[in-house]
């Protein structure tokens, strides 16, 4: 990612936070899209997905498609690609909701 790309990736963070993102980011693995994943959990387990509606990295329409294909419980938020940084409270709430739902389903099983 070039320095100007940070605004596209994390545009809802402050300038100082964007500088930290730039300073600490790393390039993805060169063979990222050729890797085979064994045992994709979303095919057999409940899933949750946060669609970042202002994401300039992965288009929200693609995120919705993926989430629907997964059968995920979908949350949408006005966020860039990094809602875990810009909207951590919502992300924590979704994680807790998911954990509680899974816990309830295993207790009732």
Where are the model-predicted features located?
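Helix-rich cap/lid subdomain of alpha/beta-hydrolase
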Residues: 1-39
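Short secondary-structure boundary/capping segments
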Residues: 38-41, 64-66
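Short, proline-enriched alpha-helix->beta-strand connector loops that line the catalytic pocket
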Residues: 42-47, 69-72
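Conserved alpha/beta-hydrolase "acid-adjacent" motif
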Residues: 56-62
């Amino acid at each position: 990612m070039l320095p100007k790309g940070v605004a596209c990736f994390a545009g809802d963070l402050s300038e100082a936070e964007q500088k930290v993102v730039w300073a600490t980011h790393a390039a993805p693995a060169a063979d990222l899209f050729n890797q085979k994943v064994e045992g994709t959990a979303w095919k057999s387990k409940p899933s949750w997905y946060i669609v970042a509606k202002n994401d300039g990295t992965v288009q929200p329409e693609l995120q919705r498609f993926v989430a629907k294909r997964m059968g995920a419980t979908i949350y949408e938020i006005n966020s860039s690609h990094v809602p875990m940084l810009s909207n951590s409270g919502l992300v924590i709430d979704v994680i807790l909701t998911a954990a509680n739902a899974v816990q309830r389903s295993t207790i009732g099983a």
